[in-house]
UniProtKB/Swiss-Prot annotation:
Residues spanning the membrane: none
Protein name, entry field: Probable malate:quinone oxidoreductase
The gene coding this protein: mqo
Pfam families xref list: Mqo (PF06039)
Catalytic activity: (S)-malate + a quinone = a quinol + oxaloacetate
Alphabetical UniProt keywords: FAD, Flavoprotein, Oxidoreductase, Tricarboxylic acid cycle
Domain of life: Bacteria
Low complexity biased stretches: 90-101
Length: 115
């Protein structure tokens, strides 16, 4: 992973570790901004700008099918890619009903055959 390191005066930061690829560059950049400029980052003005750039910022995509689909569609449109497939979530599996306990049969002797 990549670690963001910031000096105490918040005048310089560095990334340590593997070089970030495209899939991690945006989250790491946001993390650098958050650590370097914590007061500004949490201000309504910055939050508004961040959400304008990354509308799903601060929201979990896992388990949120509608938001995930929206992010996929928006990304594909912005990058002029083929629209991604619609996420089809299977219907909730029916809960298993408990079966009555089986009556134990007489145990038959088991023979262990060593070869």
């Amino acid at each position: 992973g990549t670690e963001v390191v910031v000096d105490q005066q918040k005048t310089i930061s560095a990334l340590l570790g593997a070089s970030p690829g495209a899939s991690t560059a945006a989250p790491i950049t946001l993390n650098v901004l958050k650590q370097m400029f914590p007061q500004q980052f949490n201000s309504p003005e910055w939050q508004s700008r961040i959400h304008a750039i990354v509308p799903s910022y601060g929201q979990k995509l896992n388990g949120n099918v509608a938001l995930t689909q929206q992010v996929w569609d928006d990304t594909a449109a912005t990058l002029q890619l083929t629209k991604p497939p619609v996420i089809q979530m299977p219907a909730a599996a029916p809960t298993a009903t408990a079966k009555p306990a089986e009556t134990p049969r007489e145990a038959s002797p088991q023979h262990d055959m060593a070869l």
